[in-house]
Amino acid sequence: PWRAIRAGKQLSDSKGASAALSTEVAIMAVHRAMAGFIGPKDIFRNPEAIFRQLEPTKDHSHSPFDIVLSKSGDDFAVMQMHFKLGLYEHQSASAIDGLINMISEHTDAILDGGNADNISKIKITSYEPAYGIIGDPAKRNPTTRQSADHSMVYIISSILRKALEKHENIKAEHTIEDLWKYLMLLPVDYGKNALFN
């Protein structure tokens, strides 16, 4: 139940906005606390806290997990974050890299003057988390931007379609980095016209 906005057949705006909304609530909570607003006491050891429901403790004096509070320093969680390579779920990066490497190594054979008839199927071998998150059959026909950027089928086929459409500008001497930049999926690649192309 905790993944409801991040999983399912079609993802919505809630998925795309979840980080922003939680940040907004956190900032609002800090402002209220600075103005003297007091929240419930001891939410981690409270027997009614959601944390206690999921991870029961032996008695009421223990928290189900350790929490370390700091007031200064540079060991913040944000420093452990990484950025996605583009507008797609990061589990697709290895498949995208494989496709781009294949286009780089076999430019003429794959792009064949923009003719897709030489491509009869695409087989992607991936690891379980990638399949479970973006490869399952529920993600085959996305109808929203949020579902499309979580669909391995959509991401790979869109990059390949983009390469075929722009075949005249793709040269064998392009570097892998050039191809990544050139074939990067943009917001327009997730618009209604692209979704139903």
Give the location of each predicted region:
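Terminal-appendage/accessory-domain detector
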Residues: 7-24, 31-197
